[in-house]
Each structure stands twice: as structure tokens, then as C-alpha cells.
């Protein structure tokens, strides 16, 4: 897959009504022919909900303040091409649309927490390098606490992960702040590194709900 397959970057739309930095009242998501596909607008400090996006974009309404689309590399003076399901749509560039590489976006904001009951095999195959070599496949089993992983890198269809040292987490029910996550990340560096295939072409192999936002309770 090449760099413009639409999964190498993430475009995040923000909702803010704070003074001069307030976001636009509307983000117009358009079809390739320029016709309107969806008007995403502010509704009482939240972005509007619509079934046209449900299950079709990477981040949809986890807090109502931002949505995130996989997108192509943006080009100056041109609309941003974003994925909605298997289709391409466009968004006009805005200071309130943040573009990150997929790797940076996932490393900064998310952990990978796979589903599974205690004693069950985790859903993906794990490898020591970004290559599906059957002879080197590693099977991991869910433990009593529930395994979680830091996302260390993304290379195309492969994601580099490392187990979270939950003993290093603060004993609190409050939101874990960035500085605290940095300490946990450092403590976790002694844990094994694995590679998993997070997508295959257009098919995402990880349930979106298994990408867990770091800064929520």
C-alpha cells in the first residue's frame, strides 16, 4: 500500500466555543463531486451526531468534542480527502482540523486493550517483527486483570506495541494526566515488544473499541 492509501494520516475535527479560538459553526463534509454529504455542526458545545458517520470513522463521539477521520496527506490549498467507510469525502482545510500521522495520533492519545475473558487467546497474532511469519507467531492469553498495550509505532499495516505496567499506574479513579502516563510508559519499557497487524488493506482488524482513549476515566 502506498502513502496515500488513506490510513497514514488522521484528521481530527474539534468543537470549541472559547472566545477568538472558537471552531467554525459548521464543518461541511462533501462528496467528490462537491455535493454536500453531511453538515457537522456545533450543538451546545458538542459536534452533531449522525448515523452517516456511525461505525465509519475512526473516532466518533467518544466525548462529543472531536471526531477523527483517516485521511490522505493534505496538500496546500486543496480540500482534505478523508475516509468515511470505504468512500472518499472532502473537508475544507481549517485551523480547527488537526492533521497527525496515524502513528503519532495513536501513540499520543490511545492504548490498545484487546477484548477477551481470562484464559482466552487474545484476538490477534503477535510477532517479534512486522512480518507474518507462521514460525514466529506468538499467542498471548488474557489474564485476570486484562492486558493493555502502549502503541509504540505504526508502520503501514503493522503496529508495534508493548505491555502496560499497570502497577505503575496511580491509585486513583481520576483521569490519568500526560505526565503520569509518561512515567507509566517509562516503567513499561522492560516489557516485551510485539508487532500486530492492525489492518489488512481497507479492513481494520482491531475493533475500534479496543483503541482506548488515555485521557478518559
Where are these regions (language model features)?
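Short N-terminal secondary-structure initiator segments
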Residues: 43-49
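Loop/turn positions that initiate beta-strands
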Residues: 143-149
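Boundary regions of SH3-family modules and the immediately adjacent low-complexity/disordered segments
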Residues: 1-35, 49-120, 133-136, 156, ...
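Active-site environment of non-heme Fe oxygenases that use a 2-His-1-carboxylate facial triad
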Residues: 130
